[in-house]
A protein has these predicted regions:
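A C-terminal functional module that forms or caps the active site or interfaces directly
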Residues: 82-134
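Conserved active-site and cofactor/substrate-binding residues in soluble primary-metabolism enzymes
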Residues: 45, 49, 106-109, 142, ...
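A short, hydrophobic beta-strand-centered structural micro-motif
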Residues: 1-4, 107
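Flexible loop residues that form catalytic
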Residues: 1, 19, 130
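Predominant activation on well-ordered alpha-helical scaffold segments within soluble catalytic domains
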Residues: 55, 109-112, 116, 152-156
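His/Asp/Glu-rich mid-to-C-terminal helical/loop segments that flank catalytic regions of hydrolases
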Residues: 133-160
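A short, terminal or domain-edge coil/loop segment
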Residues: 29, 50-60, 125-138, 160
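Mid-sequence, gly/pro-rich, charge-dense loop/helix-turn segments that line enzyme active sites
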Residues: 4-99
């Protein structure tokens, strides 16, 4: 699952990665962009063919994923990952540095980096289980199982 970071993202949506970056990588003293690790690109791009296919089948799969997923939206854009949770204490900074970011988790960018190094097509697909922000600890409005079922339905449609 993932935490919603973009102001338009809602609990229950599913996010897919057009690009991925690290929230907590900071080698700016050496000329790198915030979110970029030394020797790596600034962001890792989602595979264009997978994203095109996802645009074709993802929203319909999401609507039919569970009894309550009819109004959920598939959102494609920048996703982030880091070593710590984005909370009320750091959400403003994260949004300032990454204004286009939809969501953040702890694994997706590392997986994208490994896939890029191996030449394997990659796109991250995550169900939004909660929102990052002042009430992040209180606004967990959807069960992890529900968020996972929604993203799984999108991935299965992508692979079919």
């Amino acid at each position: 699952t993932t935490g919603g970071l973009g102001r338009q993202v809602e609990v229950g949506d599913v996010c897919a990665s057009a690009t991925l970056a690290y929230t907590d990588a900071d080698a700016t003293a050496f000329g790198y962009a915030r979110g970029q690790t030394p020797g790596q690109p600034e962001t890792f791009a989602g595979d264009a063919a997978l994203l095109e296919r996802l645009e074709q089948v993802g929203q319909e799969a999401l609507r039919g994923a569970t009894a309550s997923s009819g109004s959920a939206r598939l959102r494609v854009g920048q996703m982030l990952a880091g070593n710590s949770f984005v909370t009320a204490a750091n959400v403003a900074d994260t949004r300032e540095v990454f204004p286009a970011a939809l969501s953040t988790d702890m694994e997706s960018t590392a997986l994208a980096q490994v896939a890029a190094g191996a030449g394997v097509p990659f796109v991250s697909v995550r169900g939004v289980s909660d929102l990052c922000g002042p009430e992040a600890g209180q606004d967990f409005h959807i069960a992890v199982e529900e968020a996972a079922a929604r993203s799984a339905a999108v991935v299965l449609a992508l692979l079919s």
